[in-house]
């Protein structure tokens, strides 16, 4: 549910702005040149990978707040890797996080989302209790 909401916002922005990716703009290869052909005509702004990573980080942090710092650190680094690899500009990644945050805030009022989160919290509590022994 939240992944779909975040992707919708990202896809609409990508279609509107169609910003060239850094590797295409500067004629330099990414760290994974085999993916360049499929991405060269796909807009850079905002970063969809970052949006998904940030949404997952926010969700997992809500499910297990005691590990929130570690979870969000990984979510942050996942987005930054898109800049390091040459797929995105920093502003693309920042906008991906913003799309994720807005999408995550929007689903908070959904009864369906809250029901699924309640189920997930119970499942995680069981797993965490089992792993303590």
Q: What are these regions, as identified by a protein language model?
A:
Residues 85-93, 97-101, 105-110:
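Catalytic cores and adjacent binding grooves of peptidoglycan-active enzymes
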Residues 130-133:
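Long, charge-rich alpha-helical interaction segments
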């Amino acid at each position: 549910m939240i992944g779909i909401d975040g992707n919708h916002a990202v896809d609409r922005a990508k279609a509107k702005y169609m910003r060239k990716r850094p590797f295409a703009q500067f004629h330099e290869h990414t760290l994974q040149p085999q993916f360049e052909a499929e991405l060269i005509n796909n807009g850079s702004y905002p970063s969809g990978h970052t949006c998904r990573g940030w949404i997952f980080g926010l969700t997992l942090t809500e499910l297990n707040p005691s590990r929130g710092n570690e979870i969000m650190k990984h979510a942050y680094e996942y987005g930054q890797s898109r800049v390091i690899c040459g797929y995105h500009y920093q502003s693309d990644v920042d906008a991906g996080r913003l799309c994720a945050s807005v999408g995550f805030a929007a689903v908070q009022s959904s009864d369906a989302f809250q029901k699924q989160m309640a189920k997930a919290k119970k499942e995680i509590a069981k797993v965490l209790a089992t792993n303590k022994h």
